[in-house]
Amino acid sequence: MTEELVTLDTAKMLREKGFNEYCRFVIGEDRVISDIISTWNLPPNSFPVPTQSIANKWLRETKNLHIEIYRSACGYGYAIVKANNGTWMKDDDAKGPNDGGNWDTYEEALEEGLQEALKLI
């Protein structure tokens, strides 16, 4: 069992929205993931790449957005709500890639939810 890292697209969006936390890894435009010691002097075109869990926590604590992952007979989906009061913001509208409009794994649904939450900022 391993922690999932966010994708390059999500890492780029996180940086655009102000994510500046230390991450053990960076990802380049070539999609190669490398270990780093410091976020100072990152290689050109490299982006800090957190785990999905850290990205989710950052959104919750700094942007007041909580991503709820739910399970149905068709797979996994997500809803985005305000972290402080549960006010609905957006959900997946059954737009997932499988036949039931969901995602086959929890991690796929969370990745999509992360990207959609970042678009709301």
Where are these regions (language model features)?
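Catalytic phosphate/metal-binding cores of nucleic-acid and nucleotide-processing enzymes, i.e., regions
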Residues: 1-8, 25, 105-106, 110
